Amino acid sequence: VVRPALAAGKVVLSDRYFDSSVAYQGAARELDVDQVREISLWAVDNLLPDLTILLDLSAEQAIHRRNKTGVEPDRLEQEKVDFFERAREQYLKLAVEPRFLIVDANLSVDQIQAQVRARVAELIR
């Protein structure tokens, strides 16, 4: 689905990708991060995104926001705070790559949108 769309010159947006596997299945579950990364890269045939947007928020703040939704948490969302801290730490390690845009998720929606739009505009010009 992704490769044909890219070949046709289309923009492809995805909510999560292999970086999520590295952060959650690797670091957060305390598995071998390098091994999870290699398997994940194999699964996506080494197709890396041009841009990965990381909405950064502390684990405590994320859990607090999640609990305010009134929706029952899924299996992953029921994990303890240290699980999410490990995932966040891994995301921040991954985010040293230039394809990442780290956005402070404490900002207003308008501020977040402005940062994302500016970075996306650089890519599609």
Residue ranges and their predicted role:
Residues 1-5:
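N-terminal phosphate/diphosphate-binding loop that engages ATP/GTP or pyrophosphate donors
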Residues 8-11:
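Loop/turn-to-beta-strand initiation segments
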Residues 13, 51-53, 101-103:
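Hydrophobic/aromatic beta-strand patches that form the interior of the parallel beta-sheet core
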Residues 16:
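Walker B catalytic acidic pair
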Residues 19-20, 109:
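Conserved beta-strand edge residues that scaffold enzyme active sites
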Residues 20-89:
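A glycine- and Lys/Arg-enriched "phosphate-lid" helix/loop adjacent to the NTP-binding pocket
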Residues 60-125:
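NTP-dependent small-molecule kinase module
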